[in-house]
Amino acid sequence: MERIKVIEYISNLGDGGAETLVKDYVRLLDRNLFDPVVVVLRGGESSANKRTIEENKIPIIEIFHRWNIWVRVWKKLCGWWYIPYRLKRIIRSENAKVMHMHLMILKDVPHVGKDLDSMRLLFTCHSVPSKVFEGERIKEKIAAQKLIRNNQLQLIALHDDMATELNEMFGVQNTVVIRNGIDFNRFRDVSTTKEEKRKELSIPQNAFVVGHIGRFTDEKNHTYLVDVFAEIAKKRKDAFLLMVGAGDTSVTEQRLLEYGLANRYQILSHRSDVNEILRAMDVFVFPSKYEGLPLSLVEAQVASLRCIASDAVSIEAFCTENAVRLPLSSAEAWANVVLDTAIKGNPHANLDEYDMNREIKRLERLYLGEG
């Protein structure tokens, strides 16, 4: 049986949740059935996810090989024809039968034209649908509507509430839920000890380590995270903030300096050892302003960390009593909950539902057209 060529099409290969999911998809798909290739709109990334994909000898095709001011100008002026042209060439040269799309890359896809007619198209919504398809991103919604109408685009949600919202937004009833899956063994069977990882990262052995994983963007709310940590630091002189994520860290670091916490934090990026880094933490704090379903929060629960997260996060991400859900109130109130280990959460989902091996089988059935 000839293997089915699958394109995973995403805007870039950073170290965010969507990019991590794509990395896991192409790594874990049954290679007897599928032949995956990753297509990225913006190349030039240097990330742990990209390295892992390359190590697994999975091709990466870049529409734009670098991303600088000149390329951005070119994209703005000519992207409307160049991107569909490149996609069309890639689909033909790879003889692709399935294209699974992620993040904000839909608007140019309908212009590929007839080459889409014989393909199975899927799109995973990785954030709150209103943030993905409305306001300045209305072109994404228009493109999705065209692809649903003309090419039977299959919408994929990360949880049940998101599926309901997508069904209502696009007037469909068939949105499928495929959760952000995790390789449980990777986060449970970690040979590195807390002491070893702290030594490697130059974190004091006796520190109370407050951890966070997420790219440095507004929705992750790092400013509030620093405010919470500053309140924790008032009460615990051994408090240390460990953040993992790519992006512009200048605002976050300036705020830490203003609080006099210059020697009480560390920022890591492009890491492939997140499972070990979680071992170095005592508590995981996740105060997002809005979210789809954050992979890092579920990973922290699989690693048996106590987690404090905002109620902007889907309720289905709270799977154990170690995960406490809070409104974004005062930083002091959050600090008090972080420090009071007697406060427990109410599980709203089964952690086993996030087993990647289970979710990948569901995805494979979609790729095969078996619903």
Model-derived segments and their meaning:
Residues 149-187:
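A short, active-site helix/loop in glycosyltransferases that binds the activated sugar's phosphate group
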Residues 270, 289:
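Aromatic "clamp/platform" in nucleotide-sugar-dependent glycosyltransferases that forms part
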Residues 101-107, 125:
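Short His-centered aromatic/hydrophobic patch
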Residues 306-310:
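Short hydrophobic beta-strand element within catalytic cores of glycosyltransferases
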Residues 3, 8-16, 20-78, 162-169, ...:
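N-terminal strand-loop element at the rim of the active site
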Residues 19-24, 208, 212-231, 250:
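A conserved mid-protein helix/loop that constitutes part of the nucleotide-sugar donor-binding site
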Residues 17, 343-371:
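A charged, aromatic-enriched C-terminal amphipathic alpha-helix characteristic of glycosyltransferases
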